[in-house]
Swiss-Prot record:
This is Malate dehydrogenase. The gene is mdh. One of its GO terms (molecular function) is L-lactate dehydrogenase activity. The active site is at H181. NAD(+) binds at G13, A14, G15, H16, T17, G18, N101, L124, T125, N126. Belongs to the LDH/MDH superfamily. MDH type 3 family. It is an enzyme of class 1 (oxidoreductase).
Amino acid sequence: MLMVNRRKISIIGAGHTGGTLAFILAQKELGDIVLIERQQSEGMAKGKALDILESGPIWGFDTSVHGSVNIEDIKDSDIVVMTAGIPRKSGMTREELVQTNEQIVRETALQIATYAPHSIIIVLTNPVDVMTYTAFKASGFPKERIIGQSGILDAARYRTFIAQELNVSVKDVNGFVLGGHGDTMLPLINNTHINGIPVKHLISEEKIDQIVERTRKGGAEIVALLGQGSAYYAPATAIYETIDAIFNDRKRLLPSIAYLEGEYGCSDICFGVPTIIGYQGIEKIIEVDMNNDEYQQLQHSAQAVSEVKNSLKFK
């Protein structure tokens, strides 16, 4: 009898982001899905899994979606996505999240190493740069199999704001965002184009500065508007794009949080940089040319991430 080896994606955290990601992945039929929640939130995981399954006949997908509170159910996953953690509240800085979420991520990474030792881990828990570093250290996985995701999201916000300003299709806006996920992120203005035309030729420097600042505050803007909770549609879609690049070995050039060993003058830090994403995970880190001002801003961002990282104790 022919046995089909189906791909498996486990999502730890069945909240807004985890549930939305599961729904997107189910529609795309990228693999079987397991939604994991805490014991006291069993109904959330199972309820969302069932709700997604029941949309299958309408959307036309046959994806298996399973909700569980048993971490053992991630066994043999190809990809494990970590969205679990306390949510960011209005007025809360990313750094204030770090102590509680570090413990959650550390414990989860150890469990992943036990039950899915050959998986690729994608981290979304905030503050995501430091949580990616935590997952890297705790899991013992090789660096190419630990991916933090914020750059796709930040670049999407940046591109959206530019498209709105120019009243053009966002499909024609190409831009990259490097650095930490927060107030020190660095949109590469000199590398931003609208269908090949440099953005500086179309938007004033003052307006570009406003767009950059809005991009940096993009997460906080959503938090303030919602009043409770944080963004989840765009973050979930960013994770989907990463998973699609891995499973289909697309060799996509995508901004990701990667462990650096000298790239961009940074070492022993997880940080947002351009990466090639394929079947092995982060297959290459791309170093782009930048002027002195951009380089100094990037170093400032790295220092901010390092300060949060250094407040924790890693063995």
